[in-house]
Amino acid sequence: MYVLEVMSGPLDGKTWAFEEQITIGRDDAVATACITIDRYISRKHARLYREEDGRLRLADLASRNGTRVGGRALGEPEPIGLGEPFVIGRTTLRVTRS
């Protein structure tokens, strides 16, 4: 089980648990992790998913303001380490194990 945690932003400290994948966005109709209060986040902004080999991968879902990892814009989906911060809109998040 993984935990997606808001490190800083409008919902500081908020967490969501997931096993295989989680979609992050502003619209709870399409996003499992819904952050409605950050207007820089798209309806369906990014997805975290576990690959067959167990690694986590982060994908931007053609969001308007992009997804940033290590200060750079995310292009193609790429692996992300546990605890590694990433930014969507004005919100910084990370994934840990529960």
Describe the predicted segments one by one.
Residues 14-92:
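Forkhead-associated
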